[in-house]
Amino acid sequence: MTPSRTPSPWMLPVICTAAFLVIAQAFMMAPLIPRLAQVFHTNVGWVGLAVPAYLLPYGIATLVWGPLSDRFGRKPVIFGSLVLFIALTAATASATSVAALVAWRFATGIGASGVVPISLTLIGDVVPFQKRGRALGWLFGSIAGGTAAGATVGALVEPLVGWQGLFLAVSAFTAILGVAAVLMRAVPSLPRSAAPPLAAVVRGYASLLSLARGRRTYAYVAINAVVQSGVYTWLALYLRQRFGLGEVGIGLALLGYGIPGLLFGPTIGRLADRHGRSWIIPAGVALTGVCALLLAAPLPLVAVQAAIVALSLGYDLTQPLLAGIVTDLPGNRGQATAVMAFLLFTGFGLGSLLFQLALTWGFVTALILFGAGALVAAGVAVSMFRDERPHQTVPMLTPAA
């Protein structure tokens, strides 16, 4: 797909800010779990379901938004999803029970799921692969920053404005961003693809999964998401139980997550563009595993905070680079990105659920299980991604025998 005009210099700042707000709102729930359990007079297990209730439908709905963006264009889908996100985020503040909260989170997950993945597809449309790493570094740095800011702001600001005020504020800020994006014409209008029949859409997904390069990349998108989300979602409860921290202490402890992505995301992307992804991806998965194991150890709070920062860096070394590979797969880019977003966000949701199940044996056991699994995956990744050299994609495009 070729752009009809040169993209606005505001395109990347706008879509990165939108991604920041969408993800901040998603992970704003994590530190609020203990507080909302008190508000709704229930246990943390029930309130904790609000996290996967958002992430799982988010991931599933991306399979629909991708083909829709191919048919109707990236710009209408991004703005349409943004409007749904604004409305449903505001509506979440009306919840008076945990059941209503979970229901609103479910609906918001569906509505919001067109913003980030279609923005990623848009980058793939207008930025050549040789320069895509830096742009994706900014986007995923914004996602990591949103994860950190959501958790931190949720913990620090909730005592001041209430949990309802948090959702209303995110909705208002996103509405302002949407109006500014329209006025600045930040999102380019690209030529629409011919609308494929349903059978062609199904064949497109099957074709992507027939590629060895596609299968291994998608597998590590899912693995990375499960480990990162599983550990991160429950850090607020971990910090409360282990160190007795309140909302402010939890917010400050989580503040470091996302900082590496904001500071080093574009630099990591440039390294990938220049030197390839063959060693960076396994290193990121390994770092994630090491951080999970460190959190299981009896470390002081300052060391735990350092491990949380390093956990974020593990994400920054993996997901943006995996996304770069996905946007280079042959075939329909909207569908390729939709599969990645589906696995990424369903992985986030499943990671939260699986870690919650592992918590029946305690935090130490759960962290060891997740950390050991990540280290095994890192070892396998060394051989799986050995051919991801800079700008050499042709040998990887043939289906596996």
Protein language model features and the residues they cover:
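Juxtamembrane intracellular "pre-TM" segments in multi-pass secondary transporters
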Residues: 2-5, 186-218
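Helix-breaking motifs and short loop linkers at transmembrane-helix boundaries and internal kinks
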Residues: 41, 73, 94-100, 111, ...
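Conserved MFS/SLC helix-loop-helix module at the cytosolic interface between two early adjacent transmembrane helices
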Residues: 60-96
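Helix-to-loop junctions at the C-terminal end of transmembrane segments
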Residues: 62-73, 264-276, 359
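Paired small-residue
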Residues: 84, 88, 99-107, 302-310
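Cytoplasmic helix-loop-helix junction between adjacent transmembrane helices
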Residues: 104-145
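Helix-loop-helix hairpin linking two adjacent transmembrane segments in secondary transporters
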Residues: 138-185
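C-terminal transmembrane helical hairpin of 12-TM major facilitator-type secondary transporters
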Residues: 278-322
